[in-house]
């Protein structure tokens, strides 16, 4: 029984020492590999390199449109329109704050379309 325990301890110690030797060599080479950008470009496959370039490239502030669309630098889009207080226009479309007024306007739109 003591022989089995001794063999197990010897195996664990040898694997720890072997793993430390590999880890020490990797630490030294890790930073030197990243310092040479030409070597990295040669090792990367083409689609992966293209993906990294797209991630690294940032859009200019005037290129970002977002959910509200393209913005004018001079004036806002709302300034030309008449403000209606009884309706709300969001991402899901026009919603009435007053349901009676919304139903009335829906009926008027329906009647106009029928004519």
Swiss-Prot record:
The keyword Nucleus is assigned to this record: no
Propeptide: 20-56
Keyword terms, alphabetized: Amidation, Cleavage on pair of basic residues, Neuropeptide, Neurotransmitter, Secreted, Signal
Residues recorded with modification Methionine amide: 68, 92
Record's subcellular location: Secreted
InterPro entries: Tachy_Neuro_lke_CS, Tachykinin_dom, Tachykinin_fam
Signal peptide limits: 1-19
One GO CC annotation: synapse
Family per similarity comment: Belongs to the tachykinin family.
Protein's UniProt name: Protachykinin-1
Species assigned in the record: Oryctolagus cuniculus (Rabbit)
């Amino acid at each position: 029984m003591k022989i089995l325990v001794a063999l197990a301890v010897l195996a664990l110690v040898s694997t720890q020492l072997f793993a430390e030797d590999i880890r020490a060599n990797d630490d030294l080479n890790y930073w030197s590999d990243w310092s040479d950008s030409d070597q990295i470009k040669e090792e990367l496959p083409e689609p992966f390199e293209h993906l990294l370039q797209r991630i690294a490239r940032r859009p200019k502030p005037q290129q970002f449109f977002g959910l509200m669309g393209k913005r004018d630098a001079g004036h806002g889009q709302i300034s030309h329109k008449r403000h209606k207080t009884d309706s709300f226009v969001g991402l899901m479309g026009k919603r009435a704050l007053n349901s009676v007024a919304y139903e009335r306007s829906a009926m008027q739109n329906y009647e106009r379309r029928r004519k």
